[in-house]
Amino acid sequence: YAVGPDKAIDTNKFFVICANVLGGCMGSFGPKEKNPETNKLFGTTFPVITIKDIVKAQKYLVDFFGIKKLLAIAGGSMGGMQVLQFASLYPDAAYSAIPIACSASHSAQNIALNELGRQAIMADPNWKKENSSPDKGLAVARMAAHITYLSKKGLQEKFGRKLQDKGSLKFSFD
């Protein structure tokens, strides 16, 4: 939406680097990979990765490209946290930082909601099973997380006291 030809981050004018998150599931080595020592999935034995670790890997990539200084570092949500960490670790590496929809630290409420999601995942019977995914727990965790993404107005529209596209009260959601 914001990145591309003639958009806010215009790829006709700027070279955009968008790397996968270290330890993520889309092209990076992570918990779904097999541990070469045990030939089993890493799963919960995979090393903990922090925002700082991710940013250090990103800086390594920038250095590998031979880029001396970036015009800007931009990101939203967890990407915004990476922007803040990058600017903190490498204050002279970019001319500007554009953190979007993030904060430097979580509130107690955010930490509690994240723990709710973790507990939902760990309560799933598939949590500890090898070669399976706790899909039901992940679904509940996503529902809890979704609440944190909505504005007050968005929450009211989605969960307000009026019936949502229904003519009468029911005990089911169908």
Q: For the regions a protein language model found, what residue spans apply to each?
A:
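Alpha/beta-hydrolase
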Residues: 110-174
